[in-house]
Amino acid sequence: MKKTRIHRVWILFLLGIMACLQVRAQYMPVVFDKKYGDKNQIQLVCPLAGDEVAMVGKEGQKYNLTWIGREGEVLFSLPLAGFTAVNELTELEDNRILLVGQSAVMNTKGRKDNVTLSGRAVILDRSGHIVTNIYAGGQGSELMKGALLRSGSLILSGMEPKGGNSRQGILMKVDKSGRVIYQYKNAGSGYCDQFEVLGNTTEYICAAFSGDKEKEQTTVVRLDDKGKPYYV
């Protein structure tokens, strides 16, 4: 009888160990240690579906984008030609990502505004193909945040110079082609790097305009679907 009890204890003990090993094997994270570029400084990292990761790096003055798989393998890596700053990297649906920042305007032919440096928003898919490429804002403007709406339009915010050494915060809505639907400028602020899209049936934007220079103000503005301040 005593031997039977001992055997039962041993069996339960072994079953417990096996169960623990199965749990550990099931949830064991994939760890890798790899090098991406010789002098590549990683600026932004964005976790993606399927344990994949998108990274923005900078070598010298040039930016690059690398999309890596679950085990650290490079799915694609490409230079972000024209970009002078990349301020945000966001995951979108359908294995896409959104980049916003500042860029030299790559093709100025046919443009009437003579803008050579402006804000830029780019959407890429998992193969590295550019789905959307939009230049937005006046000369010297810079985008700091972006959001893709269900309609395919984009909400973009950032800053633009307004004469001398001063600047102002901007927020705009553009369609898929880059056409400006509306643009709101907050003259007392320095930039806008935070906003949220609100409303289920009617679109509202709650945006924070900030400033870190002398005489720049910090304000929170709520905009309606036409880009006008909305007062409750």
List each language-model region with its residue ranges.
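A sequence-level/structural motif corresponding to short, flexible coil/turn segments enriched
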Residues: 24-232
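Bacterial Sec-dependent N-terminal signal peptides
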Residues: 1-29
